[in-house]
Amino acid sequence: MILLTGGTGQVGRSLLALAQAQSLPLVAPTRDALDLADPRSIAAYLARQPWSAIVNAGAYTAVDQAEQDQQQAEAINAGAPGQLAAYCQDHAIPLLHLSTDYVFSGDKPSPYLETDATAPLGVYGQSKCKGETAILATACRAAIVRTAWVVSPYGKNFIKTMMRLAQQREEIQVVADQHGSPTGAPDLAQALLVILTRMLHDPQCPGGLYHATNHGETTWAGLARKVMQVSAQRGGPSARIVEIGTEAYPTAAKRPKNSRLNCDRLQQDWGITLRPWPLMVEDCVTALLNEQGAQS
């Protein structure tokens, strides 16, 4: 059996859907059964049965709230990955861990490489960075995959927010000076399963540190415009996008201005390239509109 944490999140739900289609034995416990903030809960759940691999998609992702809740963020994002990695090392099984662009400052003018120095701006990024360090401190066979700007038909995310606001407003102000690559959770899940499957079947496959986002780059405003375009084409709600600067939208945690991740290593080592982000957005918006139509 393969243990999946974070099964109710965007990537977790996408992984479960794909694993079911591929008959992969993924087990996703509820938070009551496995609390990543509680080392005793983690130890007790791990002891329930033998595991063939662990996929850690669980995280404390409330970026702004983390500034006031550092202890909880660090327990889930740093403590838990270290504990899971130690278990994987002791039992000689692979670990697949999801990380984030927030480990970087965003000051670099070009896309970030896996080898670039980390310099997180806030508590969330710091806690995720510590999680990576904790995993690498063990000798476990781990693949750490950093991603950014995750969206999907599931949970809370930027595309769903834009679609909701478009029903309520004629225009929406969106930040236009933060750059990144939107990543569809279903697309990312497909890539993660390729890595997981190979690590399961090839004990010599070492893992490593990788970046994975959909191909291409844009700004939050650019992403919002694409969402509105696709929605309007399909008869859904649409609003005019008004570009603003980061300073006009203050948040508790500072955001990286540059969240672009260079994904060349993923292609070189695994033969994986995620499709262009506009195609992903078309599928995501279409799925959301179909869901709304089914509910109305």
PLM regions: where:
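NAD(P)-cofactor binding segment of oxidoreductase domains
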Residues: 68-96
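N-terminal Rossmann NAD(P)H-binding glycine-rich loop of SDR-like oxidoreductase domains
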Residues: 1-21
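Active-site "gating" loop of Rossmann-like NAD(P)-dependent oxidoreductase/epimerase domains
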Residues: 60-63, 68, 101-121
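NAD(P)-dependent short-chain dehydrogenase/reductase
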Residues: 133-180, 186-194
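Amphipathic terminal alpha-helices
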Residues: 275-296
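NAD(P)H-binding glycine-rich loop region in Rossmannoid oxidoreductase-like domains
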Residues: 39-76
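Adenosine-cofactor binding site in Rossmann-like domains, unifying the SAM/SAH pocket
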Residues: 20-44
